[in-house]
Amino acid sequence: MPRANEIKKGMVLNYNGKLLIVKNIDIQSPSARGAATLYKMRFSDVRTGLKVEERFKGDDIVDTVTLTRRFVDFSYVDGNEYVFMDKEDYTPYTFTKEQIEEELQFIPEGGMPDMQVLTWDGQLLALELPQTADLEIIETAPGIKGASASSRTKPATMSTGLVIQVPEYLTTGEKIRIHIEECRYMGRAD
């Protein structure tokens, strides 16, 4: 089993009976001599989706779990269920709307590239999205001429219903790139 100082973002731990995906790691080096380096880790509980924070010393032993990751494409909606199809063997993976409610805000009609399903021991656990999503602005206040890139922001509604803050110079109909984890504007889409 690896030590806490060997854990990387994206790994999955079995901790206190929960499966936790590592989302972020902050390393805190103490100023006192002989004190251990602390690793403050932010997790997402695979089963419930709740955010969890834990602290470990660098030499603490942790139990890692190997999940199976499969690339999928969005296939169709059947009532309250969303079906994703494996890109290699065409296995369907079905999620309820409640299971992937947060992820649906970033998935445009027709799907997006690089989506993955996480399975463990044959059990479907989660849908993992890439770091960014390209979405179209469907509603925002009119663009202001002469507004610079560093000026104020305004709310904009995306094609999926997501509302984020964007620079004032953007207008309805433009495609923008959004950082999914931080839910923030990154720039215009290519």
Swiss-Prot record:
Q: Which family does it belong to?
A: Belongs to the elongation factor P family.
> Which SUPFAM superfamilies is this protein grouped with?
Nucleic acid-binding proteins, Translation proteins SH3-like domain
Name one process (GO BP) from the record. peptide biosynthetic process
UniProt name for this protein: Elongation factor P-like protein
Pfam families to which the protein is assigned, alphabetical? EFP, EFP_N, Elong-fact-P_C
Which Gene3D superfamilies would you find in this protein's record? 2.30.30.30, Nucleic acid-binding proteins
Q: Which GO terms describe its cellular component?
A: cytosol
GO molecular function of the protein, one example? translation elongation factor activity
Under the heading PROSITE patterns, the entry gives: EFP (PS01275)
Coiled-coil intervals: none
